Amino acid sequence: MQDVIFFDQRPRPDRDQTPRERRYYVWTVGCQMNISDSERLEAALQGVGYSPATRPEDASFIVLNSCSVRASAEERILGKLGELVRVKRQHPDTRIVLWGCMVGPNNRSIFADQLPMVDHFVSPSAVDEVVALAPNPIYTLDEPALPVRDWSHPPVSVHVPIQYGCNMTCSYCVIPLRRGRERSRPLAEIVEEVRRIVARGAKEITLLGQIVDSWGHDLPGRPELADLLEAVDPTPGLLRLRFLTSHPAWMTDRLIETVARLPRCQPEINLPVQAGSDRVLKLMRRGYTVARYKTLIARIRAAIPDISLTTDIIVGHPGETEDDFRQTMDLCAEIGFDKVHIAAFSARPGTRAAEQEQDPALAVPPAVKEERRRRLEQLQEQIATERMARFLGQTVEVLVEGESKGKWRGRTPGNRLVFFSHPADLTGQLVPVKITATSPWSLQGVPQLDDSVNAQSKENGLVKAR
């Protein structure tokens, strides 16, 4: 997964009269997989009769969905649990659940001693198990909950997990220890879930997995991600289809060809390289070389010339020298990624890299990690500035996601953020936008729409005052 995100829910105003005993509070830290899990949980809780609360003290059922990718994420959760001690003291009947990647198979007993305010510890993605702990349900679910918590305003884009767990043994990653081995959801189940989501108003689907390219290898018949894309692409009403996160060892020519051919598959691939040094890649146990990665990038660009390539990089992994880091800088400059998610190495208990960091000869000082992170960010900002400048004067297709600070916000097929002004509510529509200004991180433009759009918007009552 990519960035660590902190996500909180907001209540539906039409349910303000729900008593405290049927209110929940969900607080989520982590990647898009965690956010999707929490959305599905909230939908399920609402389905059994609960409503969201804006504050934990207003809820009888509190769930913290945790992340272990970096120490800072765990610190956020522990800090939140510290705040909940007061809530538990005021309302002893409050039920608190610690959910997600902090809860592994071997640490529940440890947490039970360290975190007495927590009533239950639940492993990642186990939505049904969490729902079963809610103390005051009044309904039962007729069908599986979808990963959308509020259908009163259907989201334009929805992430759909297709796989849980990970079989890789990357030196720095704790996810396999917490989420377990890979488990692929059946193709028919995913296709039906996508159909239900799109039928209710979503326009874009992102298929989600820790190593999304490996989906299906554990299912009967060993289907591939390309097969799933073929099955999802024709969904009526679907405008765009994406997937993440990929792994260089699992990216196949067939998958590349499928992305290039299918009309709704977007020209974007997130392909984490993690380092530009073969020596560091070996320490990381990534399973490929820099040369192999470059060859793969060349094949992708040959098949999909307008591809948007993003990647993840860790700086300061134990054993990384200044020369190793310079090789990473050189790789970024050579490939020219559209976006790079950069993280300084954070030792996670139980991983091989955490053991390596105990060796003074391998450990990279925190100040050096931070300095390398800043240097790489500066380089990537220069690269992104140049790559985004190519769009100046071009007209791009934008799927409008919503409003932000008085402008409409949307994304191009390559997932580049675009802002523009228009009096009509264009949410969920594909809009041609001529780019008039660029920055490293977003584009500004003018919609290329005829007067009939404005007239139709007025007729439908969609024009907003600005």
From Swiss-Prot:
GO-annotated biological processes: tRNA methylthiolation
Residue span(s) of domain MTTase N-terminal: 22-139
Main subcellular location of this protein, as a coarse class: cytoplasm
Cofactor requirements of the protein: [4Fe-4S] cluster
Keywords, ordered alphabetically: 4Fe-4S, Cytoplasm, Iron, Iron-sulfur, Metal-binding, S-adenosyl-L-methionine, Transferase, tRNA processing
General function of this protein: Catalyzes the methylthiolation of N6-(dimethylallyl)adenosine (i(6)A), leading to the formation of 2-methylthio-N6-(dimethylallyl)adenosine (ms(2)i(6)A) at position 37 in tRNAs that read codons beginning with uridine.
Quaternary state and interactors: Monomer.
Name the record gives this protein: tRNA-2-methylthio-N(6)-dimethylallyladenosine synthase
Organism of origin: Chloroflexus aurantiacus (strain ATCC 29366 / DSM 635 / J-10-fl)
Gene that this polypeptide is encoded by: miaB
